[in-house]
Amino acid sequence: WVEGDWDGLHYRLELVLADQATAWFWHVELFNASLHHERVDLLLLQDLALAPWGAVRLNEAYVSHYIDHHPLAHPAHGTLIASRQNQPVDGRAPWLLSGCLGFGVGWATDARQLWPAHAAGTAEASALGADLPSARWQHEHSLVALQGERFVLASGARTQRGFFGWLQADHPAASGPDDLSVVDQVMALPEARWTPPPSVADDGGEAGNLFASAPRFAAREARADAHELHAWYPGPWRH
C-alpha cells in the first residue's frame, strides 16, 4: 500500500489480491484534512493486454486491437467493462471484468480518449479534468477507464472507495448481460471488504517487536548480595 497527501486530502491506496479467485481489489481510503468540503471522484486506468508476454512485446498495437470492450450496466455498481481477447491464446479467450466497488458513472476503452494524438507523451491525461466520454473506441491503445460516482467529502470526514478486477483464463462466448452474475462472485470474496490498516505508534517509532511489546521484567533498586547470587546461579562460577 501507499499513502500520501494531495491538496488537503490524505489518501491510502492498497492493492489486495484474492486468495480463492483470480481477482484483485484497489481499496482507497480518503480523509479530508482541509477546512472546507471537497468534491471528489476516483478514476481507474488500466492498460490491458490479455495475451502472453512474448506476443505483447512482439507487437503491442496488434494485440491491443483484438481486445473487445463491452460496457455492462449493473443495478448496484453502475457501469462495468468486460474485456475479451478475441485473438485466441492457446485456443482460449482471456477475459477481464472491471468495475467499481461503489457505483461507476463514466468509462472509456482507448488511451486516445484521454491522451489525444497532439498530447502523446505528456505525463497527465488531458481528459482527467472532465467526465469520461462513456463511448467505445477500439483502436490500438486498449485501456480500461472507469469513473466512480462523484461525492462530497466534508472537512474532517473519512471514506473508503475502490475498484475490482476479475480475470478468467477462457471466456468462450462474447461478453453480454449474462456476465453480470460474476459481480456476485466478486463481492462475495472476503477481500472485497475494506479492512482498517494496522495501527502505527503515534510517536513514529519503529514497528512493534518482542522487546517493545513484551511485559517488562520486574526490577528492584537494591543490588543482590552474594547469598542471593549463589541461589540464582548454583553452578560453578567462572569469574
Where are the regions a protein language model picked out?
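Short Pro-Gly-centered flexible turn/kink motifs
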Residues: 38, 151-169
